[in-house]
Amino acid sequence: MTRENKSSTGKNRRPRILVVTPEITYLPSGMGNMACKLNAKAGGLADVSASLVAALFDLGADVHVALPHYRRMFHIDVGQLISDELRVYKSRMPDSRIHLAEDRCFYYRDTVYSNSQDENPKLALAFTREVLNNIIPFVQPDLIHCNDWMTGLVPGAARRMGIPCLFTVHNIHTHHLTLAQVEDSGIDAAEFWANLFYTRVPYNYEESRNTNQIDMQASGVFASHYINTVSPTFLEEIVNGWHDFIPTALREEIRNKHRAGCAIGILNAPDASDNPETDPHIEVCYDAATHREAKRANKVAFQHKVGLEEDPDVPLFFWPSRLDPAQKGPQLLADILYRFMSRHWRQRVQIALVANGVFQKPFHDILHFHEMYGRLAVCDFNQGLSQLGYAASDFTLVPSLFEPCGLPQMVGQLYGSLPVVHDTGGLHDTVEHLDPAQNQGNGFVFRIYDSRGLDWAMEKAIEFYKCAPEVRERNIARVMREGKARFNHETCARAYIEIYEKMLNRPLVRSFE
């Protein structure tokens, strides 16, 4: 069906949304026979994509998903399911809304992204080629929703096709490449080259082809009809120039969209599976009313697994985020760790890190040099262990330098593990400093990004832990209830639906109110 023919009949059906994402953790079973196999995660984008698609699907939206075909990560038997057989397999699923970008560069990968900075743009180009040449013509979407820099070329092509496009900025990372590289990947860049963002003003196609680099993230913002960040405050911080490390091109293009009234911040939400009432990874499930004894049991189970002293009465701090000193602030904790633990040694305070990253080694060094065995645990990331960590801990550490959204501080509240955060971005939008006497607030917030600020906030957490049990339990139960009501993916999905409907100028779901 041609675009023109489709437009003449489009009013007779629900608008069709194509979500283009390089990461996903799961998809609803009703979207196709392969939905249960699809899990490719590098960070929060995968969780957010999965939650949004699931919520849109549950609300009755005609939502489709395009993602790379990571055969190895999807646990598909590559030896028995070669490309031709896969096409036959997919042809038996007429209702499938899952569209896999086929390229050998995806098939044998163990991770979504490469450690090689040269390889990641090649992966993005292969994904883009399949989306533009095969998936969009097949799906015939009314609106395309792109996510992060790997999809940054798609909005330019979508604008050329006359398809409205929403671009979500999940983080500030970007890559650069040339029109020649785009051409060599099998993409007809001449069709939409003028809709891309370059390091210098382009005069013509040939002049720009080999030397004028394209900024992929800025191109996505520049060419899209509407953009969103994943928290209102992070958008405000970008527009007001609060962070000097944000690339100038990206900041200016976001400012332009904001001035035009085409930018908004939508707070992400944790996945529906982040629920202590049903979580299969924790020792004892619980809700706000039963959290006290259940969290004690979970604490002992977690302590046993990570090698901490088994005692349900000691305060436990939990670090669930990757150990990335450029964003997540592990160096702040490393700076104060010995002094903080020394001050509270008699109280037997414990800290557990379940996270990967370049800063894991300094924590191992601190552990062994100061012989903090039984008090400090440093473990590789494991999803089940991380979930148990939320259920076991009293406090969740999220001292990020900047945070486009952040999910750990929200998940912590759902599990009764109060967050300790730096006042920035999505952390500002989701955490208010606790006043236990007034039954207000939900965590511990420091404003100045340095180790003394984190130390102050952790001391406030210890003060709260020393409160009378009834005060502590009352506030934790309140935080859990409020978090459950506020942080859910249906609320997030409805915010996206409002944008979709604004862009389409018609309802997305007939029954949506």
Feature annotation, model-predicted:
Residues 1-513:
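Catalytic cores of nucleotide-sugar-dependent glycosyltransferases that transfer UDP/GDP/TDP-activated
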